[in-house]
A protein has these predicted regions:
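Juxtamembrane intracellular "pre-TM" segments in multi-pass secondary transporters
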Residues: 1-12, 191-225
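Substrate-agnostic recognition of the 12-TM MFS/MFS-like secondary transporter fold
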Residues: 13-31, 51-69, 73-88, 105-164, ...
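Small-residue hotspots at the loop-to-helix junctions and early N-terminal turns
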Residues: 29-32, 36, 41-48, 142, ...
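Transmembrane alpha-helix termini and helix-breaking/packing motifs in multi-pass membrane transporters
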Residues: 34-40, 93-98, 154-174, 247-248, ...
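MFS-fold secondary transporters
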Residues: 38, 91-96, 113, 186, ...
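C-terminal transmembrane bundle of multi-pass solute transporters/carriers
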Residues: 60, 71, 77, 208, ...
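C-terminal ends and interior cores of transmembrane alpha-helices
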Residues: 83-100, 293-306
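Helix-loop junctions on the cytosolic side of multi-pass membrane transporters
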Residues: 99, 126, 130, 172-202, ...
Length: 427
């Protein structure tokens, strides 16, 4: 890359590196709070509610958050949201240090922090568009995927180690320190060009503008709906995986960590691949094909295998292409959506593409506990089912993996017939 391009990417590298550290700190706190709450309650439902509280504002309020992003200064929006979220974390630390921290405190604080993230995220997306040259979109998408991958690998390892060594307070302190670095980087070193404020519409009208754009751009909307189905299946998979690995004679909680880490490593490799791969001839096709490969291989391998090595291989195959898909989708969105509309359109995308995640988590758990496991228990003497899925607890989860594999394959093939009429090539 030449010096001119490097100079243009200076602001991005500062923003990316400092925000990545802040994301790692936040993820560590979330993981440590899960450990702390489970120790206090012994309830999986209470810890799951932490995620629900932080995720609900993201799904419900995203459309309006995007409208606010397009109305206000991007840097100020990010700084205010990050600061308020950090204050929430500080409140948790104070309550913890004074032995006053209660479960409902965490739920309320998580909901407010989730709301701040809902507003901050589209502002951050638009900022990336404004400070990055158009021909570098694929590269920065790969780096953003790399961040998400590294955070998913590192945060449970670092948080659990620090939590065991010195407690919840030290994890929160690291999080607050990472916030300070991110705040200084954004406030003092990042120059974000602001778009002229031409519109004087209400926030509701601005939100409707995002929906109108999606209605007029069927390629973008079709991709979003396609990926909402992918997220439904992937989140059901996430709910099924622990029930598949932990009861297995060769599994257990430690093996679940290894298998999960294999997915994170695969995403790191995929993110590196994105940064060096050439521009594809048709990015829409890449989005479709990568998901067909991911959903059409991983679940089948897991359904019919009993060896941890094969589980890890399945995770690698299933996740290594996810950053490739994300990068190509990101380039399509950044180049297709006008900058002055990106905040509200990204927010609409967040609502439509991600609302299926909590639904998938719920359905996956219900299917395993109430359908698949009881079915396998009542057919434990069936030689065919035992040969295919094993026996005992966990065999129902293996059956669920097959169901998810079939559902994922059918979803990709059905939507493939829709997506084939759309093509996107960089100009």
């Amino acid at each position: 890359m030449n010096n001119s391009t490097n100079n243009k990417l200076r602001d991005f590298y500062i923003l990316w590196s400092t925000q990545s550290l802040s994301q790692l700190g936040s993820a560590m706190t979330a993981f440590a709070l899960t450990l702390w709450l489970y120790e206090k309650t012994g309830s999986a439902l209470s810890t799951a509610a932490l995620t629900i509280c932080s995720y609900a504002p993201y799904v419900i309020m995203s459309i309006f958050a995007g409208a606010l992003t397009d109305r206000f200064n991007k840097k100020a929006t990010m700084l205010v949201c990050d600061t308020l979220a950090a204050l929430c974390t500080l409140i948790v630390l104070i309550l913890y240090k004074t032995d006053s921290l209660m479960m409902w405190h965490l739920y309320a604080i998580n909901a407010f922090s989730g709301l701040m993230n809902t507003v901050q995220q589209p502002a951050s997306e638009v900022t990336m568009t404004l400070i990055v040259p158009k021909d570098s979109y694929q590269k920065i998408s790969g780096l953003n995927s790399l961040t998400r991958s590294l955070v998913s690998v590192l945060n449970p390892l670092l948080a659990s180690a620090l939590y065991a060594f010195s407690g919840l307070g030290s994890v929160i302190a690291v999080d607050l320190g990472s916030f300070v670095l991110a705040f200084i980087g954004l406030a003092g070193f990042i120059r974000i060009p602001e778009q002229p404020k031409e519109v004087k519409e209400s926030t509701l009208e601005l939100a409707k503008g995002g929906l109108r754009f999606l209605k007029k751009t069927p390629m973008v909307f079709s991709l979003i709906i396609f990926l909402s189905g992918v997220n439904l299946i992937a989140s059901a998979f996430n709910a099924t995986l622990p029930a598949y690995v932990i009861p297995n004679p060769k599994g257990g909680s430690n093996m679940l960590g290894i298998v999960t880490s294999a997915a994170g490593v695969a995403m790191v490799l995929g993110s590196i691949l994105v940064t060096v791969m050439p521009k594809p001839k048709d990015r829409v096709k890449v989005v479709f094909v990568t998901m067909l490969i991911s959903l059409g291989t991983e679940n089948y391998i897991l359904a019919f295998s009993r060896e941890p090595v094969l589980w890890c291989i399945a995770e690698i195959i299933g996740w290594i292409l996810v950053p490739v898909m994300s990068a190509n989708l990101d380039v399509i969105l950044r180049n297709t959506i006008p900058v002055d509309l990106q905040g509200r359109v990204y927010a609409c995308r967040n609502t439509f593409q991600f609302f299926t995640i909590p639904i998938g988590l719920f359905l996956g758990g219900v299917m395993v506990d109430n359908v698949c496991e009881p079915f396998m228990a009542t057919h434990e003497y069936s030689e065919l089912l035992t040969m295919l899925f094993g026996s005992g607890k966990g065999s129902g989860a293996a059956l669920m993996m097959l169901i998810l594999g079939v559902a994922g394959t059918l979803h990709c093939l059905v939507f493939g017939s829709i997506l084939r009429k759309y093509h996107y090539k960089d100009t």
